[in-house]
A protein has these predicted regions:
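Hydrophobic faces of well-ordered beta-strands that scaffold small-molecule active sites
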Residues: 27-29, 89-91, 162
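Conserved, mostly hydrophobic/aromatic
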Residues: 30, 67, 119
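N-terminal accessory alpha/beta regions
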Residues: 1-7
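Single conserved hydrophobic/aromatic residue that forms the stacking wall/gate
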Residues: 178-189
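Catalytic domains of cell-wall/extracellular-matrix polysaccharide-remodeling enzymes
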Residues: 50-105, 171-180
Length: 189
C-alpha cells in the first residue's frame, strides 16, 4: 500500500511524515502483501514481515515495535513467531466468541511468549465508528463525540485499555470532524 500511496497519493505520504515528525505516533508492521502467509508458510510470513519492517524503517526512520497481522488473525503460534522477530506487542481482534466472559479492555500476553503484549480490538466501539457512523438507519444515529465518550466512560473503571482500530479508509471528512474534540473529551475526571 505504501508504494501505491507514493505513486498515486504522495500527499498522504507527506501527511504520514508530518504525523511521524510529531513523535506522538508509532507505525505498525504487518505482512507486506497483507496476505495470509501466517496461516500457511512460516518462511514466507517472516519474509513478508521483514520486507514491511524494512520499508517502514526506510520511510520513517524507525522500526515498528508492534505488529498487526492481516485481518487481526491471531493464534499463540503466530504470537510466538511474532515475538521471535523482536516485536513487543501485537494487535488482535477482541472477538466475543473467543474471549467469552473476558473483556478486551486489558493487556493480555501470548502463552508461548509472555513478553509479547496483546492489545485486543473492541469490535463494538470500533465498528460503531467504522461501519455504523454514517448509517442513518442505526438506532444511535447521529453519533456525536459526547455520546461515544459516554459509552466509554460507562465501562468499569478498572478497564483502562480501550483499543479502537479501524481502516484509514473509514475516516471520511464527517468522521474526522467528529473525532476532533475527542482527546479533550476523553479525559476522565
Amino acid at each position: 500500500a505504501l508504494e501505491q500511496l507514493e505513486i498515486h497519493a504522495p500527499a498522504v505520504i507527506d501527511l504520514l511524515h508530518q504525523l511521524n515528525d510529531t513523535g506522538c505516533c508509532e507505525f505498525l508492521c504487518e505482512p507486506y502483501s497483507h496476505g495470509l502467509s501466517s496461516l500457511a508458510n512460516e518462511d514466507c510470513f517472516r519474509e513478508e514481515v521483514i520486507r514491511q519492517r524494512n520499508k517502514m524503517k526506510q520511510m520513517f526512520g524507525k522500526e515498528p515495535k508492534v505488529f498487526r497481522n492481516s485481518s487481526l488473525i491471531y493464534s499463540d503460534d503466530i504470537g510466538g513467531l511474532v515475538a521471535s522477530m523482536g516485536f513487543k506487542g501485537m494487535l488482535t481482534e477482541g472477538a466475543k466468541h473467543i474471549l467469552g466472559w473476558k473483556s478486551p479492555h486489558y493487556v493480555y500476553h501470548c502463552n508461548q511468549a509472555p513478553s509479547l503484549k496483546l492489545l485486543l480490538r473492541d469490535f463494538k466501539l470500533s465498528d460503531d465508528i467504522s461501519l455504523r457512523f454514517s448509517n442513518s438507519d442505526w438506532a444511535e444515529y447521529p453519533l456525536f463525540a459526547d455520546k461515544y465518550i459516554s459509552w466509554i466512560d460507562a465501562l468499569p473503571q478498572e478497564e483502562q485499555v480501550i483499543n479502537i482500530f479501524m481502516e484509514l479508509s473509514a475516516l471520511g471528512m464527517a468522521c474526522l470532524l467528529y473525532t476532533s474534540p475527542s482527546p479533550r473529551d476523553m479525559r476522565r475526571s
